[in-house]
């Protein structure tokens, strides 16, 4: 399975053989080719990501999953050619074709109609687009039909090659129904590997597994005996294996390989050649406004250096041309900064032209033909995170990913280390007006930060503020007398509305340090009193010369004074002429549930100015995303609402577009062209460097990372679409065998016309009518969980039939789904025939784009009612869906009522992780030590909301990340037993700070996690339950919940032994 050079390189995936043909995907389309190799032809022509094409048993049709319309849906087309037909209108982000049934229906997996994205049920789809039949297996990852039915357990959602050597709770497991009676038992339960893609070849069950360290094809008899390996384990992973019942085809590193049989045949590579234009490899211009990265204005704001999709350009603000300063394909240039030397404007930026980051310098007027920008410090800077240039242009300050603060001398190129931190990276680099001092925000133990000062000549470093608070965003005032900054040192708590708690929700405020001991505070009384209004700033000339900054280090911390403004949420403080600017952010909830309407945009961020002379706050603009100040402090370069504007720094811009006080910079003059192949090579290499610099172990946990990159780099020549690249990067990340190594594309595939969903279960009845079987109830405390058919005035009930949508009759075969395409979030008229007969009604509803929140709340209500019924009302029930804001909200919806019962079942199954587990555990670990008995009222426990009796947790393989941690913490703290199965096993965390040049998010497992009782052992293993209770396919099919049943039994048994705490009687 080593890489060889094909006649026409292409990145081939998801093969399926049938007879003399093989179907596969390449270039974001489905193709067919002769199984013995040769020229391929397209089946689809949508140029969107597709997967898992499967040829029908009779060889006449091919079905696949397409994202043409946004969410993945099932499509089918004739093998001989012709238009494709869309079979599903499910709107689920987890839908996938997996094959065909023996009777000619398409076999697909989907979470449609489920309460969780982890529950992908198998369905059989008729080719006429009629209702699918749900197969009685429960959540599965694959179905192999043959002599017996074999199921693959539902995975977390990623392939084995994307997390190689994974051994956690969701590692693929095989179940077989040997007696064909619906009773499944484990197959190969002793195989320590991650199993996927099972299928029958004759009387042998074949599958992929990596139990020998590399994904390979294996097979055995139905009883698990005679296990054989059919492909080597010294190369790339074998992926996407499929069969026509005799031959097997699989993918590996973008190539297709075949085995003629499982009786000793050797794998051989298929020589498949593609034709066509390969449009995704053609160069194209980009829209500069859409791909705007950052900008830096010159001294007087006549022009700016602008970063656009890896290039740096100079743009004049009012008319005039734009010119490229750095736009070489396959090189990423970023963080441009302007400076002035001898009256001439210059630009410096970060480049990866030589691989590791370096600085490049060029005049704003551009380089002479054939000249190149001056490059300094290549390989000495690490990953550059922040950049600042001294006002005199003599040096550049750099904050590196490894905590270093560096100074790079422009003339000599010397790199000097100023300081370094073991607690993260520095930020807010800023020079004094005379270039003699550098200030920055220096990290301490999270979340603390302090300000530091360095003399740029002798590099002596002093503390400007003590390490007590979070001090950030420093800026020297333009007269050099003060250092302004932001700090979260306002302690004015607010009482929680739902529970007894206090929070500091607006703790930041701007502060100022007088640098010389003899400089008075600008906010105090002035010897000569306050001046009247200053003259028009436009008419005020720059002061003579550059002001000198004198700093008396002794007593600096005692000279900190707050600006006379209220505490709020502030960011990005900058100095301007006669004042300072900052962004003030509105206080909003994380979920947006407190908005007047869920669809409303976030409140605006305000750009504010504090006038140091007049001692007042001025509002310069709203909806500010980002800003920079010109060198003379008179103008602001503002990025707002997708536009780059130039406005005054001392007053609100006029409403007159393109006036002197409201200039919109025309970015359409920027000419930046993307050459995809070159850009993808740069992205591949940058991904490798960022992982090298941030992975939780410097030795890459024993993986030869350079060797990995070298091995996969030739595969890059096959890549023809962005989806190919994403898959390749996933596989490269997967070589580390570590959780949280993600690759997430920016998105944008499909038409954007999202499927409308009605929040109800519908089915086709014998009379041909599509009737409502159940209307899901709304959860009034969650705006995302509104039920369209339960809205006031709709009055649609179970049994009613939907006969028309928007005036178009519902097809008795396909139902209302096709008529609801593109209706999500829009008013739609339904024509409804009541179940008891009578006149049809017309109701206006607003369909949903996502039913999961609605179905989730209904599932929780069902589980809670079940626990109450089984325990006679003695046990409470809480489900925690994640360790983020949604999960925190969900806990508190029913905390008071459920915790007040005698015992508590805490269900953390399918917990998606996050970072709030310590808050959850803090709630669960409370113990009652007293009671408050007010007259005429019920007693309350002390502390409040503490469990009265036993707590039992329920976990499954989909409890992951912080969902792993919460279970380990529950065990370590002795809160109660954990029931279920081993959890996901991924606890090396990430911060999601890096995006590639095209917006693709890449993550680096950086934050290793140690847990009492497990040490480092939760990663790639999971947390073992105290009481193991698997949920078998037959349990799902029968609607049984043995894990919850066991938790209830344990809690009731504990109550028998130790009754719940109750309030005492009054003396």
Curated annotation (Swiss-Prot):
Its main location: cytoplasm. SUPFAM superfamilies: ClpP/crotonase, PDZ domain-like, Tricorn protease N-terminal domain. Its EC number is 3.4.21.-. The active site is at 740 (charge relay system), 961 (nucleophile), 1019 (charge relay system). Residues 518-551 are annotated as: Disordered. Stimulated by MgCl2. The record marks 962 as: Transition state stabilizer. Forms a homohexameric complex; it is not known if it assembles into higher-order structures. This is Tricorn protease homolog 1. The gene is tri1.
